Amino acid sequence: METIVLATSNTNKVEEFNQLFTTSAATIVSARAYGGMPAVEETGRTFQANAYLKAAALSQKLKKSHWVLSDDSGLEVDFLKGAPGIFSARYAGAQASDEENVEKLIDALKGLPKRQRRARFRCV
């Protein structure tokens, strides 16, 4: 059976990917199984670029001995012209919690009628 290492330490993501691959002969494991993710500065300007940075960093750490899969995701709000987008996890600051990011987003949408609060979650 083939093992694919997911470039994340998020156990929920590993479970989600394993559900997607139920008919596959591959098993998805977290980077934690190999000592965790190396530090990756997400400097890409797109979700695809940041996903590539994560996959490349983990692949290099594993010395290209395993298949590596990565993703990047975020919330795109129409009124905010696609923001927070690639900055969703650090929208309220580099060390911000999920709650702080949500609070900043709610503040940014204050006064906007609910029918105009359109957004999408993008994952690549």
Regions found by a protein language model. Give the residues of each.
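Anionic-ligand binding patches
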Residues: E2-V5, T11-V124
